[in-house]
Design a protein with these regions (language model features):
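PLP-dependent amino-acid enzyme catalytic core
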Residues: 1-405
Length: 405
């Protein structure tokens, strides 16, 4: 059965409506002002399962025979495909076994179980989990649903592009995140069928750039290691079946750092009131790397499944990167009242103290200075400089040190 054709994309678009929301584009005034383009967000984080993956999973399962479904389904996933398959299998009344890396966030594990799937935790990264899933499929006769290297799955994911064109026919650029490449395959292939002149840009984390490495080599390439906070895109080897489609239809690949993802998370929370997981943020971080102006750009936000502990850590790191939280070290005479004097100086500058570390061990005698490390909240870089200047004027010889929260 030939996939990734216009007929199949249209068929898939109708099929996935049974289980998905048609997520409406969100125009971003903030990102448009920041980049000089007309930026729209495709919020797949608003799907029932919290990510786009249910599109490919549901369409793939719809193409299976009844006998293939009843044997039971198995897949490997860092989280979102797991939930997609679990939910789709539940809709079809099939058994689902999901192999997930041991590093998978707890929220994704629990949500997958909530759809009735059996979860097996195995390996540190997706590739190890996938190898184990294939072993279980061989041993138990399960039907394997690949998370990205499957043309039917990619066709289902590509239905996102159909919705984008329906709502914004004159779209000029689409930014799509890349893990293994299934979403990029579907979106870029359909986008080029609908408008050969459109530019489709893939975005990967710099620490998991398997597709960029494969592009450069002209063949599927395996990375020795992956290291990124974007767990859903931490893939060593892209799909071999889909790679020719990506070579043909993807115009470029941009990589973004983990630091850029952290700042993008803060931007989405503060300016759009949206929770977007780290793996869904590359297309936001990549906007500043586009060397174009006044273009209609759509960034696909692929998911929003993020546990609260990770969320808290990312917010704090983002505030540090934006100079909204910082730590300063000052030396004080070791005598009563000095702490009150420093506090008064900070209060006058509206610095909000959130942590104090008073270290007497740096002094050599009772008359020498002791170190005080102060972690503060402020309004940004200018306010931070204002506080430092006030401390200098008061004679405290402040020194910026690493913030540990």
């Amino acid at each position: 059965m030939k996939m990734l054709t216009l007929d199949k994309f249209e068929e898939a678009s109708e099929k996935v409506k049974e289980v998905t929301l048609e997520t409406k584009l969100v125009y971003s005034d903030y990102l448009s002002d920041q980049t000089g383009n007309k930026v729209y967000l495709k919020p797949e984080n608003m799907q029932f399962t919290g990510a786009y993956k249910v599109r490919g999973a549901y369409y793939k399962i719809s193409t299976l025979s009844e006998e293939e479904r009843q044997r039971g389904l198995i897949t490997a996933s860092a989280g979102n495909h797991a939930q997609g398959v679990a939910y789709a299998a539940k809709c079809y009344g099939c058994k689902a076994v999901i192999v997930m890396p041991t590093t998978t966030p707890l929220i994704k594990v629990n949500r997958t179980k909530s759809y009735g799937a059996e979860v097996v935790l195995y390996g540190d990264v997706y590739d190890e989990a996938c190898a184990h899933a294939l072993e279980l499929a061989e041993k138990n006769g399960y039907t394997f649903i690949h998370p990205f290297d499957d043309l039917a799955v990619a066709t289902g994911q590509g239905t996102i592009a159909m919705e984008i064109f329906k709502e914004l026919p004159l779209v000029e650029y689409i930014l799509v995140p890349i893990g293994g490449g299934g979403l990029a395959t579907g979106v870029s292939t359909l986008a080029k069928l609908l408008n050969p002149k459109i530019k489709v840009i893939g975005v990967e984390p710099a620490g998991a750039n398997c597709m960029q490495a494969s592009f450069a080599a002209g063949k599927v390439t395996t990375l020795p290691t992956v290291n990124t906070i974007a767990d859903g895109t931490a893939v060593k080897t892209p799909g071999s079946k889909i790679f020719p489609y990506i070579q043909k239809n993807l115009d470029d690949i941009i990589t973004v750092t983990d630091d850029e993802l952290i700042v993008s998370f803060l931007d989405m929370v503060e300016n759009h009131k949206m929770i977007v997981e780290n793996s869904g943020l590359p297309t936001v971080a990549a906007l500043k790397h586009l060397n174009v102006k006044d273009k209609r750009v759509v960034s696909i936000l692929s998911g929003g499944n993020m546990d609260v502990i990770t969320m808290s850590s990312v917010v704090q790191q983002g505030l540090i990167f934006r100079d909204r939280i910082f730590t300063v070290s000052v030396l004080l005479p070791d005598k009563p009242g000095e702490l009150a004097k420093v506090s008064e100086t900070l209060a006058k500058e509206q610095g909000n103290v959130i942590k104090l570390e008073h270290n007497q061990f740096v002094s050599t005698n009772r008359n020498a200075a002791v170190e005080l490390r102060i972690t503060l909240e402020c309004f940004g870089t200018d306010h931070k400089k204002q506080i430092i200047k006030a401390l200098e004027k008061a004679g405290y010889k402040p020194k910026i040190v690493r913030t540990m929260i």
